């Protein structure tokens, strides 16, 4: 039986094999966060409109689009949410084990731009010293920031 299954698999080839694998295995979203720092080492935090009121502060974050690199997701999300441009640097976190998502985080340096908020998603944006982070900061984001000090 295994031999027949292997022969059938080999006859499928390329894109058909990928479609079968996609249907057979878990599919998930990838949440991407950017730890954006300016020239003074301050970190960019956003007060997110759609997050629970007691923990609205967090890093710029969003979900990767199909065929988009995670680095491109960081750049896109920061630009969409704040109007700022960044240079994405290092992967600092990869977390799995969630039911429907994987989370990744990258460091990024501010390149330029003026803050122009996406008022649907973001209430405000501020730069914070890493030793003076606000109350209401998502705890997992606090941990990520501390990893990059």
Regions inferred by a protein language model and the residue ranges of each:
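A short beta-turn/loop motif at secondary-structure boundaries
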Residues: 26, 51, 94-99, 119
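Conserved Nudix-box catalytic region and its N-terminal flanking loop in Nudix hydrolases
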Residues: 38, 42-80
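Active-site-adjacent beta-strand/loop module that shapes the phosphate/pyrophosphate-binding cleft
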Residues: 95-116, 126
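Acidic, metal-coordinating catalytic segment for phosphate/diphosphate chemistry
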Residues: 1-33
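Residue-level preference for beta-strand/loop junctions
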Residues: 28, 55, 100-102
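NUDIX/MutT-family hydrolases
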Residues: 117-148
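A short coil-to-beta-strand element that immediately follows conserved catalytic motifs
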Residues: 84-93
């Amino acid at each position: 039986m295994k031999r027949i299954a292997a022969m059938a698999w080999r006859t499928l080839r390329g894109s058909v094999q990928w479609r079968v694998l996609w249907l057979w295995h878990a599919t998930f979203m990838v949440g991407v966060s950017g730890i954006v720092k300016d020239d003074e080492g301050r970190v960019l935090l956003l007060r997110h409109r759609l997050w629970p009121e007691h923990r609205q502060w967090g890093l710029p974050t969003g979900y990767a689009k199909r065929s988009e690199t995670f680095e491109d997701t960081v750049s896109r999300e920061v630009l969409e949410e704040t109007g700022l441009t960044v240079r994405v640097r290092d992967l600092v976190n990869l977390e799995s084990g969630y039911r429907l998502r994987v989370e990744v985080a990258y460091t990024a340096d501010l390149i330029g731009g003026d803050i122009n908020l996406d008022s649907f998603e973001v209430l405000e944006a501020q730069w914070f010293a890493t030793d003076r982070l606000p109350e209401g900061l998502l705890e997992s984001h606090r941990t990520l920031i501390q990893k990059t000090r």
